[in-house]
């Protein structure tokens, strides 16, 4: 069983942000290896924290952060020909404070460029599920995009669509917006660049996953720019937390297919009399272990990496 990390505390590295899953630290210039190009850098740590319905739950999933980080790193490398990413290749151990065990962070942390985030979640959908299905049932559209009549739950869309959403703070909920609203927020050129990159990467990843018996139903990306306005993909990439993966052999139109993510946790929480606000309830050990196994299976099938 891997070591569990619920929260990272690294003396000498200023904490910049503690999100639902990731802790992000500024790296002082003197801690960077000699010859590091000018600019600001971050240490991003994927913890084992578990969130559902935008609430961080009290029980972690052992090794989840390592699995998420490895999936992201796999996809960053796999898609580097399509889009530059925030990774630097700087060894994590070289920037850790003295006395910190590098083994604890080796598989769950990365050194990244510090970028200016594009303030919109970039979502690609290839199938009608989740909030997209709810929008379609209500309006016949998803994020203002007209879709054919008579589509069923989990049905593949004629073409993948781009459906942006707002970026919510921890504890708040993202809200779907249409493309025009995104243009007003970030400008037409940036909106088009993000949309085109999102769909290009989604199509590539969906084809790759399909060859391995997995359907990539939808996914969420985050983008940022450097001082020269160059666009990068950042944060996490095509993980079971940011994406909806289905086993192709269990896919059936008209149903909500099982997924390689924390669906066991969400299903359990739906049985409770809980208002979906903090603090969250305790999760049974069986649910934790089944969820951990699902993350591990996704890592194995997509990247060929086995977990302990």
Swiss-Prot record:
Superkingdom assignment: Bacteria
This protein's GO CC annotations = cytoplasm
Give any single GO term for biological process.
'de novo' IMP biosynthetic process
Going by the record, the broad EC class of this enzyme is: ligase
Keyword annotations: ATP-binding, Ligase, Nucleotide-binding, Purine biosynthesis
GO MF: ATP binding; phosphoribosylaminoimidazolesuccinocarboxamide synthase activity
EC numbers = 6.3.2.6
Q: Which reaction does it catalyse?
A: 5-amino-1-(5-phospho-D-ribosyl)imidazole-4-carboxylate + L-aspartate + ATP = (2S)-2-[5-amino-1-(5-phospho-beta-D-ribosyl)imidazole-4-carboxamido]succinate + ADP + phosphate + 2 H(+)
Q: Which InterPro entries match?
A: SAICAR_synt/ADE2_N (IPR028923), SAICAR_synth (IPR001636), SAICAR_synthetase_CS (IPR018236)
Q: Which Pfam families match?
A: SAICAR_synt (PF01259)
Pathway of this protein? Purine metabolism; IMP biosynthesis via de novo pathway; 5-amino-1-(5-phospho-D-ribosyl)imidazole-4-carboxamide from 5-amino-1-(5-phospho-D-ribosyl)imidazole-4-carboxylate: step 1/2
Q: Which family does it belong to?
A: Belongs to the SAICAR synthetase family.
PANTHER family (UniProt xref): PHOSPHORIBOSYLAMINOIMIDAZOLE-SUCCINOCARBOXAMIDE SYNTHASE
UniProt-recorded name of the protein: Phosphoribosylaminoimidazole-succinocarboxamide synthase
Please report the organism this UniProt entry assigns to the protein: Stenotrophomonas maltophilia (strain R551-3)
Give me the gene this protein comes from. purC
